[in-house]
Each structure stands twice: as structure tokens, then as C-alpha cells.
Amino acid sequence: MALTKAEMAEHLFEKLGMNKRDAKDLVEAFFEEVREALESGEQVKLSGFGNFDLRQKSERPGRNPKTGEDIPIKARRVVTFRPGQKLKSRVENTKPTE
């Protein structure tokens, strides 16, 4: 099971008493800020949660799995996430639910 943006908005509505539209707008605005920062090359640091970083991957050789043909994999930027110590500790000390 995964937590969706709609579920986040619903939790804000329930926990903070926000109206549903404002909660949805808040979630969308938060993710838009993160997206814009990453697109412009900035690191995103969320205290107590973790960091979103950009990493440059250089071009490298690859292979088409169907044909076995050698193909180059283009250089690109990728987003990485490194959880903060507080998040790591909380996740490590929580029993998984099924």
C-alpha cells in the first residue's frame, strides 16, 4: 500500500481541520515547490526527514536486452533521496504492518 497525495490531503483535513480544498492545494503547492527547486538544480533539505539531491550520471555503455545490441545510455540528472537520522530511527524501530 502507498500513501497518495489525495490521502495526504485527507489526513490534513482530518488532523488540522482544514477544508478539503485547502488541504489539497497545500499538498500540491508543497510538491510543486520541491519539483521547482530540483528542476533549478537546488538541493531540498527537509529537517528531520531527509534530503533530495541531484546527481549527474555520465554516459555509459548499455545493452538492449532483447537484441543484445550495444547502445549508449545518455548522460542525465537523477534525483536521489537520503533519509535523515530521525526518519531512519523511526522506521527502524517500527514493526511492519501487512
Swiss-Prot record:
Keyword Transcription regulation (UniProt): yes
A Gene Ontology biological process term: regulation of translation
Protein's name in the database: Integration host factor subunit alpha
Function: This protein is one of the two subunits of integration host factor, a specific DNA-binding protein that functions in genetic recombination as well as in transcriptional and translational control.
SMART domains: BHL
Molecular functions (GO terms): DNA binding; structural constituent of chromatin
NCBIfam families, per the entry: himA, PRK00285.1
Subunit comment: Heterodimer of an alpha and a beta chain.
Annotated segments matching region Disordered: 52-73
Biased composition (Basic and acidic residues): 54-73
Database matches in InterPro entries: Hist_DNA-bd (IPR000119), Histone-like_DNA-bd_CS (IPR020816), IHF-like_DNA-bd_dom_sf (IPR010992), IHF_alpha (IPR005684)
Family: Belongs to the bacterial histone-like protein family.
Gene Ontology cellular component list: cytosol
Assigned keywords, A-Z: DNA recombination, DNA-binding, Transcription, Transcription regulation, Translation regulation
High-level lineage: Bacteria, Pseudomonadati, Pseudomonadota, Gammaproteobacteria, Alteromonadales
Gene3D superfamilies per the UniProt record, alphabetical: IHF-like DNA-binding proteins (4.10.520.10)
Domain of life: Bacteria
Any Pfam family: Bac_DNA_binding
